[in-house]
Every structure is written in structure tokens, then in C-alpha cells.
């Protein structure tokens, strides 16, 4: 008889609309529905699963079974606030209940927003039977293993029919001490769940399994075992590993988010306790808090990823590309140290060694086995990385080196250089100040030079005329430069001015088609005749070598050499400026003043200068040190040019005369001023 009454009550309750149940309970006399009265009289409330979206909390059976109590405004005995249909479970305290009816929580859409993902439905503040103090006298902690105070009867309910499974979660096994469920990503049904089985299909003996399928809950982060409810000690555990595999689902929901970012992955695991690397969380423990979960076979869980349990130690990822990064350029005008193995970890030995097991150890990084392809499950990445510094240069344990294999690694000095530009013919650029195609070397000639064409000082006909270079000082050495990217003028070497008054024994200049100044002048102090020859690195169809001069005019050559040195071989070719310089560096610095190119900047006030020594003198003004003093009046100056201006003034002239009369030694740089003062007398 009791069984028949229970079946009849189940049939009636199955056809009852939950919203009408709430409407009837809200009436003071509870008389709105005779069907509800009949059901309530025949069935104990303890046999009815209660849902928070219907009653907002569990209602004591004494309040419902006694229709004379009209205190429906305060159904909950522990609060004075009337319940609301959208209330959360944490708004009410726990109280004694009867029976083994589990409590279910419903998370409304847009209940809570997750930072970075907008407003989405999230699983939060869920209630499980284990949180009831009457049923759980002992706190349930997954870290201590399955509690012995619970059995399978705690999770059985009367078969009362379908229960809107798509909006309920049966969260019986959330490990409150390990994971805060409010930090999960937005809840959504697994993509495969809607395709495998409809959400309205009841499964197994109870309809309170996760959404639609026993193996596909509505949250991709609550993955449970198929047979979880059949075993007394195997609860519906939270799958920690699914937080890593869940990115496959999230990548389709959030295509604009890079889920491969390690910082984003770790953000979703901030509440996982424990130490170790991220790979440690990808290894299912053999025992402990998740022991029951790991007992399930791979086919019984939705972890989304397989693991090679035989290889529990995964080497951390290594950024191998950074070991082959391009080193920073050292610009010409910047004071920098030698670019050597002490200052760069990127040098690779180039002494002809081959990559083999004798002189280099292979650095193997084992890849994680892919669950999608068995053919590549054992694939691994093998790289050869060389470090010429020392075995401790890269401290990662994956990379091992032998320092003896890299002794004598050459030091490299890097200077930026733009790609070479070939020319159709031997011609100068539009700006004659830029030297592009000159390569100079010295070699001895046994044949005499003869002939010297007359040349205009401002004309350059390289195809039809022989170019004769000026007499070079024995101490002159060509400066090696390379073209820098951009419109930097300091990367080019100005062409020495060409003259027509050279002797027949002067050196003759020849030009090739190279784009960089590659030549080096090797001076020979012997009295034999020298000439300049072209050393071209590319095939050439014509030779521009020419021999001019006459051996009989050696005396006039020496005279012209001394005159050229006194006058200056390097002349500024800007209109209206015919200044001469004895050094190419001085001419280049002077050209910067015309182009307004000031590469040297004060480190304090950021003022720019065309010459480096001007910048250094300027920086002394900031220090307040006045290192230059007059030998007579002891007036001090921060710069030498200021002291020289003092000596040229009327007061300074008197100081120099006084110093001469007193026999005070004047610095060598001041002798010229003293001599000029004496001549004026």
C-alpha cells in the first residue's frame, strides 16, 4: 500500500509545474491547488528534491505539512528575510533536514561575470549533500581521501521523473579546500554534449546526473566518471586536468583570446594548491586526493588529453630561438666595448667544426604525447646548441656543453652595413663628397710612370681620364667604414681633393665598382716608385689602372709633397667654403657642420655636437671643474679654447708678456701666442 501511494505521488508531482508549486505555496491558506494539497498530504517533503530556482532554499517539512501556519513570508527558520526565486544558496544557513534528499543549485544566466570574458553564466556557490552538517558530522576533505561517513545511499533519490537537466548541476564532489569554483571560466555545456545525447534524456537510475550525459556535464571543468554514482567511495570529482584541456573548447568560444599564453593558463589555476612547475599539474597523482579519479580508465573520463604515465618528469620548455638571436649592432660613433664572447651569448664557433656527438651534446626535449595521433606519440625535438662561453652560460639543465670544444672562439666586432648596390658603370654619385667605389692598395712597380693628363679640379671623368691621387703622408691610413642604413653622412668617406700639380712619381689612383672602402694603404719607405692598383672583388670588364709621372722628377715630387702637407690635402667642396684639412677625419667632422648632422649628444643636457671632442669639452661645463688656468693671473677656465681666447684678449696679452719677463714657462700650446706677441713689439 505504501509503495502504491508513493508511485501515485510521483506521477502527480511529475506533471506539476514548478512555477505553480511556488505560486500555491505563496498563498497564505495554501488552498490554491487541490492537487498540491493531495500530494502534500500523501508524500513527505523529505522525499521531494528541492531546487533553488523554485524555492530559493530548502523548506522545513514542518512548515509545509501544517497548513495552519501562515508564516509563508518567512519560510526559512533561520532568517527574517523572505526568500527570493533568484537567491543563492549561500544566503541561508544550514539547518537540520530529514531523509537523504540532495540539494541542487541553479546558476542563473549572467549571475556573475568573470573578469576578461564579459557577463557569462558561471558555476558558483554550489551546495552538495556533503555541506549539510546533519549528514556530514565530519568535514569532507578530498586531500584526506574519501570520507567514510558517506555511502551510496547518500546519493540516491526517488525516481520522480525528468528534472530540467540542462540547467542543473549535481556538484557532489567539489574539493572546497583545493579549488574555489567561483574562479572557473564561464560555464557552458561541452560541445560534444549537445551532439551525443539530448539534454532531456535521463541516464542510469537517477535524473540528477550532469547535463544531458553522464560523461558530459554542463561545465567543461567538472568532468566526472561514468560509474561515479555506482561506487560508494568514488564521488564525482572535479577534474583538475580539464582546466588545461578545456582551452580547446574555449578557443572556439573566444577566438580572439590566445589561450596558449602561459600567463592566461596559470590565471585559471591560481587556486590549485601545491608546488612545482605547470607540468606537475598535468600529471595525475597515483594516490591521495584524486586517487579515486585516477582509478577510472581513460574511456570513462573526459579529461581531453592523454598522458604518458611512464614518463612523469617532463623537461620544461626552453626558448631555443633566443640562443640564435641577432646581436645588437655596435654603431660607429658610440663608445662601446669589444663585441666578444664576454659580452654576447650568441656567438657560434666558425672554425670548421662539424655537428657530431664528439664535439657537441644533443639537447633533446621530449614532447608530450599527443592523444590524437599515435604515429607521432614518441616524437621528440633534437637540437644542437653551442655556447662558446662556458658550461654555465645557460643554466638550464636541458642544455649541456663542453667548454673545451669552444676554446679560441673568434671575437667579432659588428658594424651595421646596408646591402651593396651595384652600378652600371664606373661613375661617381651625385654628391661628390660621398666616396662609394674606391679600393686602394699599394704595390711596387718596376716600370717608370710617364704622362700626366691635365685635370680640372671639379671634373671627374672616370671613363676617359686617369686619376692621380695626391701625395700621401707616410702616416696616413685609410679609415675602414661601412654604409649604415638611412641617410647618415658619417658612414661615407670624403674623396681626397684631386690636384694637377703632382710630380711624375706621385701615386696614381684607380677606382673600382665596390660600394665600400675596403682598401688599406701599406706604405713603403723605400725610394722605389709606387703606384695604386685596383683590387676588385667582382669580375670587371675594363681596367682603370694608369701610370703617370716621370722618374726624373723626384726632386720636384719631394717639394710638392711638403707643400701639399702644409696646405692640406682635404678640401671642403661646399660652395663658398674652401677650407683645407690635413686629416680626413677633420674634413668629415667639418662636413657634419654643413649637413647639420650632430651625432654626438651630451649625456646630461642632450645637446648635440658635430665633433666628439666638442661634446667632451661641453660635458666638463656640467661638472664645474675648471682645469685650465692662466699662468700669470691664475684665472681658470673649463675649456682650453676659452683659455686661448683669454690669451688673445688684451688682458691675456699682458699676462703672456708678464710670464715671459718673469721666466714663467708657458705650455707648448701657448708658445704661438707668445711668439705672435713678440713680433707685435
From Swiss-Prot:
Task: Name the UniProt key words of this record, in alphabetical order.
Answer: Cytoplasm, DNA-binding, Metal-binding, Nucleus, Phosphoprotein, Repeat, Transcription, Transcription regulation, Zinc, Zinc-finger
One GO BP annotation is: intracellular calcium ion homeostasis
Please state the residue ranges covered by C2H2-type zinc fingers.
570-594, 600-622, 628-650
Return the Gene3D superfamilies for the record: Classic Zinc Finger
| Main location group | nucleus
The record's listing under InterPro entries reads: Znf_C2H2_sf, Znf_C2H2_type
Q: Where in the cell is it found?
A: Nucleus; Cytoplasm
Post-translational modification summary for this protein: Phosphorylated. Dephosphorylated by calcineurin which leads to rapid translocation from the cytoplasm to the nucleus.
- For region Disordered, the annotated ranges are 1-29, 66-96, 340-372, 410-433, 520-563, 662-681
Per its UniProt entry, which superkingdom is the organism in? Eukaryota
Record field: compositional bias (Low complexity): 416-428, 550-559
SMART domains the record matches: ZnF_C2H2
* GO CC annotations, alphabetized: cytoplasm; cytosol; nucleus
Provide the GO MF annotations for this entry: 14-3-3 protein binding; DNA-binding transcription activator activity, RNA polymerase II-specific; RNA polymerase II cis-regulatory region sequence-specific DNA binding; zinc ion binding
Please provide an example of a Pfam family that matches this protein in its UniProt record.
zf-C2H2
Residues bearing PTM Phosphoserine = 543, 546
Renumbered to this chain, the Polar residues biased-composition regions fall at: 66-86, 340-358, 528-549
Stretches with biased composition (Basic and acidic residues):
1-15
- Family, similarity comment: Belongs to the EGR C2H2-type zinc-finger protein family.
What is the annotated role of this protein in its UniProt record? Involved in the regulation of calcium ion homeostasis. Binds to the calcineurin-dependent response element. Transcriptionally regulates pmc1.
Q: What is this protein called?
A: Transcriptional regulator prz1
Lineage of source species:
Eukaryota, Fungi, Dikarya, Ascomycota, Taphrinomycotina
Encoding gene (name): prz1
Amino acid at each position: 500500500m505504501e509503495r502504491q501511494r508513493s508511485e501515485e505521488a510521483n506521477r502527480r508531482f511529475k506533471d506539476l509545474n514548478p512555477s505553480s508549486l511556488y505560486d500555491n505555496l505563496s498563498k497564505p491558506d495554501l488552498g490554491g491547488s487541490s492537487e498540491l494539497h493531495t500530494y502534500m498530504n500523501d508524500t513527505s517533503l523529505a522525499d521531494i528534491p528541492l531546487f533553488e530556482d523554485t524555492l530559493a532554499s530548502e523548506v522545513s517539512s514542518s512548515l509545509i505539512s501544517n497548513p495552519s501556519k501562515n508564516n509563508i513570508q518567512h519560510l526559512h527558520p533561520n532568517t527574517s528575510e523572505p526568500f527570493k526565486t533568484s537567491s543563492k544558496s549561500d544566503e541561508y544557513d544550514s539547518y537540520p533536514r530529514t531523509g537523504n534528499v540532495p540539494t541542487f543549485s541553479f546558476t542563473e544566466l549572467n549571475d556573475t561575470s568573470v573578469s576578461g570574458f564579459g557577463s557569462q553564466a558561471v558555476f558558483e556557490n554550489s551546495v552538495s549533500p556533503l555541506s549539510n552538517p546533519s549528514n556530514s558530522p565530519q568535514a569532507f576533505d578530498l586531500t584526506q581521501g574519501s570520507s567514510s561517513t558517506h555511502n551510496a545511499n547518500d546519493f540516491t533519490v526517488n525516481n520522480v521523473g525528468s528534472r530540467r537537466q540542462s540547467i542543473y548541476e549535481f556538484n557532489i564532489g567539489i574539493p572546497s579546500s583545493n579549488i574555489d569554483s567561483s574562479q572557473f571560466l564561464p560555464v557552458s555545456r561541452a560541445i560534444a554534449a549537445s551532439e551525443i545525447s539530448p539534454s532531456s534524456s535521463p541516464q542510469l537510475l537517477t535524473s540528477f546526473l550532469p547535463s544531458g550525459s553522464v560523461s558530459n556535464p554542463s561545465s567543461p571543468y567538472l568532468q566526472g566518471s561514468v560509474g561515479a554514482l555506482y561506487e560508494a567511495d568514488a564521488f564525482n570529482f572535479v577534474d583538475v586536468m580539464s582546466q588545461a584541456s578545456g582551452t580547446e573548447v574555449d578557443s572556439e568560444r573566444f577566438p580572439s583570446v590566445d589561450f596558449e599564453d602561459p600567463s592566461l593558463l596559470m590565471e585559471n589555476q591560481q587556486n590549485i594548491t601545491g608546488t612545482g612547475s605547470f607540468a606537475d599539474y598535468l600529471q595525475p597523482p597515483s594516490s591521495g586526493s584524486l586517487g579515486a579519479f585516477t582509478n577510472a580508465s581513460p574511456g570513462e573520463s573526459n579529461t581531453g588529453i592523454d598522458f604518458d604515465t611512464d614518463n612523469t618528469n617532463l623537461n620544461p620548455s626552453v626558448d631555443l630561438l633566443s640562443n640564435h638571436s641577432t646581436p645588437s649592432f655596435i654603431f660607429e660613433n658610440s663608445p662601446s666595448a669589444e663585441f666578444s664572447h664576454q659580452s654576447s651569448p650568441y656567438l657560434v664557433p666558425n672554425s670548421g667544426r662539424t655537428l657530431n656527438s664528439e664535439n657537441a651534446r644533443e639537447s633533446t626535449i621530449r614532447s608530450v604525447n599527443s592523444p590524437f595521433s599515435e604515429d607521432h606519440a614518441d616524437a621528440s625535438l633534437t637540437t644542437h646548441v653551442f655556447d662558446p662561453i662556458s658550461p654555465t652560460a645557460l643554466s638550464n639543465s636541458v642544455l649541456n656543453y663542453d667548454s673545451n670544444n669552444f676554446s679560441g672562439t673568434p671575437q667579432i666586432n659588428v658594424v651595421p652595413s646596408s646591402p651593396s648596390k651595384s652600378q652600371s658603370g664606373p661613375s661617381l654619385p651625385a654628391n661628390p663628397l660621398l666616396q662609394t667605389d674606391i679600393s686602394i692598395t699599394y704595390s711596387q712597380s718596376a716600370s717608370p710612370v710617364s704622362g700626366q693628363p691635365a685635370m680640372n679640379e671639379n671634373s671627374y671623368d672616370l671613363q676617359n681620364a686617369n686619376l692621380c691621387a695626391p701625395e700621401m703622408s707616410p702616416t696616413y691610413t685609410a679609415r675602414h667604414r661601412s654604409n649604415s642604413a638611412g641617410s647618415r653622412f658619417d658612414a661615407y668617406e670624403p674623396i681626397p681633393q684631386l690636384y694637377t700639380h703632382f710630380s711624375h712619381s706621385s701615386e696614381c689612383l684607380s677606382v673600382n665598382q665596390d660600394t665600400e672602402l675596403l682598401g688599406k694603404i701599406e706604405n713603403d719607405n723605400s725610394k722605389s716608385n709606387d703606384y695604386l692598383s685596383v683590387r676588385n672583388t667582382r669580375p670587371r670588364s675594363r681596367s682603370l689602372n694608369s701610370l703617370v709621372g716621370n722618374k726624373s722628377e723626384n726632386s720636384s715630387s719631394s717639394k710638392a709633397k711638403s707643400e701639399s702637407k702644409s696646405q692640406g690635402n682635404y678640401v671642403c667642396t661646399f660652395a663658398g667654403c674652401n677650407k683645407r684639412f690635413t686629416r680626413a677625419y677633420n674634413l668629415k667632422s667639418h662636413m657634419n657642420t654643413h649637413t647639420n648632422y650632430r651625432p654626438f649628444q651630451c649625456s646630461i643636457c642632450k645637446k648635440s655636437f658635430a665633433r666628439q671632442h666638442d661634446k667632451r669639452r661641453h660635458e666638463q661645463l656640467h661638472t664645474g671643474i675648471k682645469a685650465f688656468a692662466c699662468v700669470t693671473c691664475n684665472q681658470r677656465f673649463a675649456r682650453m679654447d676659452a683659455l686661448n681666447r683669454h690669451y688673445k684678449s688684451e688682458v691675456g696679452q699682458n699676462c703672456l708678456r708678464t710670464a715671459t719677463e718673469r721666466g714663467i714657462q708657458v705650455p707648448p700650446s701657448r708658445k704661438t701666442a707668445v711668439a705672435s706677441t713678440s713680433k707685435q713689439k
